[in-house]
Each structure stands twice: as C-alpha cells, then as structure tokens.
C-alpha cells in the first residue's frame, strides 16, 4: 500500500492526466487538492477523447472514490457540464465526492478576472480568465462562498450579501460593468447545490477513513511546480500551491501520510501565457514540437510555447517537491529530430549557474547552456518495454535521470493508455532504482 502525490515538474501541461489515469487503476481514492477550471487534462479511452478540468481522472474506474478536495476552487456550472459529459459517455459518477469546504467560483469572479487582465495591458499575467485568482483572493480575505453554502438558501443569502455588494461596486465604478442581480445568482447557485448535494462530503474525514482502512490514496495536482504561488516564476504563476506540500494543505492530511512523490515532465518543455522561459525555441523546431505534440491548451486552446528540456528547472522541481521518481511524457514527439538539446545550466550576467533564480528579472536575463545529444529518427509510438526503445532514446532518458538525480518510473509515448512503458508501479512497487 502506498499514498502517492502526482505533481507537474514544469509549467503544467506535462501529461499528469494520463499518468494519474494510469495510476488510478491501483488507487482506491484519488484526490484533487488544488486549482480549479484553469487546469485541464485530456484522457483517451477507446478512441474517445475526454477533457476534464475538475473531476479527477480516476472517475473512469467505477470502484474508485474521486474527491475534489478543500484546496480546490469549484465552478459548479462547469463541474456539472463535466458530470453530464461523463454520464453521456456511460461512465458511472457515483464515486465522485466534493469537499463541503471547497470554495466556489462565482459569476463576479470571472468578470473581475477578465477585467483585471485586460486592464494590465502589456503587463498581463496570462490568466485563463476563469475567475481562479479572484476566488482564491476572496478565500484569503475570508469573504468567499463555499460548497456547503449552496445547500441552504438562508445561508447563501447571508454569505453572499457583503461580497456581492463589494464586487458590484468594483465592477460598475472601476470597470463600467453592469452590476449582477443577487436574486438571479441565488436561484442559479441553489439549483447547482441541489444537483451536487449527493456528492458533498467532509473531505478530511473521507481521506482519514480511507487511510485508516489501508487504502491506496492518489493525490492529483494541477498546473506545475513553476506555476506555484510561492515557489514559481512570480508573478506569472497560479493562485494556489501545486507542489507536493500543497497536497497536505489542500486535502487536509499530514505529511507523514505521503509515501511517494512522482514528478511528471515532458521530454521537452512548454509554457502557456506570459513569463520568462529560458529554453524557449523559435522557428521550425518550435513549430515541429508544437504540431507533433498538439501543444494547445485544454482549457484555453492557446498555443503553447515550446523549448528544449530544462534540467535546471527539473532539478529545482526535484528539490522543492522531494521527488522520488519521474514520469517522462511525450518522448515520441522527439522521434523525427536528428539532434536534441538539453539545458544543463544557465548563464547569468556572464557567470555560469546551476540553480534556478527565484527572481523573475534575473530569470529573464538567463541564457541556456546546452548539451547536445543524438536523436533516434524512428518511431517510438509502438514501444511497450525499455528494450524496444532505440539506443539513442535510452541514452536520452538515462541522461535526464542522471541530470535530475532521480530515477524514471514511467515513459509515455503517446496519448493512448497502452502507449506507455511502466518500469515500476509507483504505488505497489518497492522504492528502488528504476532507470538511471
């Protein structure tokens, strides 16, 4: 039995959904511990493409409990769309549970998010415009609406009074946006509450009960390490903590409950939105990675920025999260390249550094120092064990493991479930050297 955290080791979009889906087969409980509908993961099942933003990937397994934890912010309108989509595809959603203390994204949060981002002009952050930041801001200011508030009309009227008055004032006086109607919001969100009520639980008690019964618990993060509010490329970050420590806070468990932390990293690097990106590529190779990797955001549809694998941020992710092993995804995207580069250090103000600068101004000045490796120029999409991989592909993986000083447990070679090499089951397997 093992309790495992799956986190993104880059700027999000690493393929965590597929890895979580894979590991969910061995999990009894899957917990989403932070983020909101600004995240998105795509799962391919029997040629069906399922795109989820809030519901954990484990929902595809009927005996698995899927819990949206207290650290997650929930847009009930989008959540219900996901529920309806799953039901239409014949997927049982009885295992879905929602923490009663999760905060709710309200209509004014979305309006404020869009208005504030537009107002920033050239200094925009690159927000998805889904209201995540304003929702977390209200949570921090103790002015938020929680899932439990949608279950009682009198309570919803009471807790909505002050924030709606404040937000309407800001929307109207600063941004020239028409005020929202309280009665309409109450009616709409009480309806959401009725539909979701059968899924609402006490998050901490649910996880504690599972742990007491020796069940396997999988903690699923959204976004990635470099988007962490405290440890990412601030201010170009999200409004929560995707790193492994965030799992304890967002799920309501102690750190001693965590047995293993798995980092998910692409075989190259991508980033959506604004912010420094040291290994970013331009021109034909960037286009090739983007096209072969289908690098368009699940949530926004925005084209992702692409670059070579950055070992500096990789080592930073290992340290910040305490990674035990790695899952490397999209290795197949590199199949056609005759030469592949990996960033092994930065140059900052004429000096070589091997650490990640936490100051975004310094990071913008950094230049990558690359190690060139030979490509393999043949398809890896049908490889199912390590011995099937071309020698240069194996050399590439070994180099990444050596550079990051952490073993590789899983290699993904495409979107489908079976396009995966599992070197060791991170939940049931012993903690030992995998691929170094």
From Swiss-Prot:
Give, as in the UniProt entry, the pathway in which the protein acts.
Answer: Purine metabolism; AMP biosynthesis via de novo pathway; AMP from IMP: step 1/2
Cell compartments where the protein resides: Cytoplasm
The UniProt record gives the binding positions of Mg(2+) as: 13, 40
E.C. numbers: 6.3.4.4
What detail does the entry give on cofactor binding? Binds 1 Mg(2+) ion per subunit.
* Residues at which GTP binds: 12-18, 40-42, 304, 330-332, 412-414
Could you name the active-site residues?
A: 13 (proton acceptor), 41 (proton donor)
- The answer to keyword Ligase applying to this record is yes
Q: Name one GO molecular function term.
A: magnesium ion binding
Q: Which reaction does it catalyse?
A: IMP + L-aspartate + GTP = N(6)-(1,2-dicarboxyethyl)-AMP + GDP + phosphate + 2 H(+)
Question: What would be one Gene Ontology cellular-component term for the protein?
Answer: cytoplasm
Its needed co-factors are:
Mg(2+)
* Binding positions (substrate): 298-304
Q: What class of enzyme is it?
A: ligase
Q: Which InterPro entries match?
A: Adenylosuccin_syn_GTP-bd (IPR018220), Adenylosuccin_syn_Lys_AS (IPR033128), Adenylosuccinate_synth_dom1 (IPR042109), Adenylosuccinate_synth_dom2 (IPR042110), Adenylosuccinate_synth_dom3 (IPR042111), Adenylosuccinate_synthetase (IPR001114), P-loop_NTPase (IPR027417)
The principal localisation class reads cytoplasm
One GO term (biological process): IMP metabolic process
> Which keywords fit this entry according to its UniProt record?
Cytoplasm, GTP-binding, Ligase, Magnesium, Metal-binding, Nucleotide-binding, Purine biosynthesis
Residues at which IMP binds: 13-16, 38-41, 128, 142, 223, 238, 302
Instruction: Describe, as the record does, how this protein assembles with itself and its partners.
Output: Homodimer.
The record's listing under NCBIfam families reads: PRK01117.1, purA
HAMAP family xrefs: Adenylosucc_synth
What is the purpose of this protein?
Plays an important role in the de novo pathway of purine nucleotide biosynthesis. Catalyzes the first committed step in the biosynthesis of AMP from IMP.
Its family remark reads: Belongs to the adenylosuccinate synthetase family.
This protein's name:
Adenylosuccinate synthetase
* Source organism per UniProt: Prochlorococcus marinus (strain MIT 9515)
What gene makes this protein? Answer: purA
């Amino acid at each position: 039995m093992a309790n495992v955290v799956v986190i993104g080791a880059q700027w999000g979009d690493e393929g965590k959904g597929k890895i979580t889906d894979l590991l969910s087969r061995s999990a009894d409980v899957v917990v989403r511990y932070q983020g909101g509908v600004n995240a998105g993961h795509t799962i391919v099942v029997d040629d069906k493409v399922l795109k989820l933003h809030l519901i954990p990937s484990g929902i595809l397994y009927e005996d698995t409990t899927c819990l949206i934890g207290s650290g997650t912010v929930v847009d009930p309108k989008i959540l219900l769309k996901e529920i309806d989509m799953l039901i239409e595809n014949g997927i049982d959603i009885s295992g879905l549970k929602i923490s009663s203390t999760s905060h709710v994204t309200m209509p004014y949060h979305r309006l404020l998010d869009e208005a504030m981002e537009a107002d920033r002009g050239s200094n925009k952050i690159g927000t998805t415009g889904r209201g995540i930041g304003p929702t977390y801001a209200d949570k921090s200011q103790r002015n938020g609406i929680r899932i439990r508030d949608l279950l009682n009309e009198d309570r919803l009227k009471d807790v909505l009074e002050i924030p709606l008055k404040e937000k309407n004032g800001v929307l109207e006086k600063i941004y020239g946006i028409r005020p929202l109607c309280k009665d309409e919001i109450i009616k709409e969100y009480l309806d959401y509450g009725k539909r979701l009520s059968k899924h609402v639980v006490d998050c901490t008690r649910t996880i504690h009960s599972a742990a007491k019964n020796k069940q396997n618990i999988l903690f699923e993060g959204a976004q990635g390490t470099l988007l962490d509010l405290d440890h990412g490329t601030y201010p170009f970050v999200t409004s929560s903590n995707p790193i492994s420590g965030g799992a304890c806070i967002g799920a309501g468990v102690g750190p001693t409950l965590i047995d293993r932390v798995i980092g998910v990293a692409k075989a190259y690097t991508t980033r959506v939105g604004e912010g420094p990106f040291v290994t970013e590529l331009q021109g034909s190779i960037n286009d090739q990675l983007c096209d072969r990797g289908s690098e368009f955001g699940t949530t926004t549809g925005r084209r992702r920025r692409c670059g070579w694998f950055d070992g500096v941020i990789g080592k930073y992710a290992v340290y910040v999260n305490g990674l035990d092993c790695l899952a490397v995804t999209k290795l197949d995207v590199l199949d056609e390249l005759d030469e592949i580069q990996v960033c092994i250090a930065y140059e900052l103000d004429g000096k070589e550094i091997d650490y990640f600068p936490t100051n975004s101004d310094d990071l913008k000045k950094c230049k990558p120092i690359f190690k060139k490796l030979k490509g393999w120029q043949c398809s890896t999409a049908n490889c199912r064990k390590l011995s099937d991989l071309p020698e240069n592909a194996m050399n590439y993986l070994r180099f990444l493991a050596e550079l990051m000083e952490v073993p590789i447990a899983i290699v993904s070679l495409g979107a489908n479930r079976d396009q995966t090499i599992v070197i060791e089951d991170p939940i049931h397997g012993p903690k030992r050297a995998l691929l170094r």
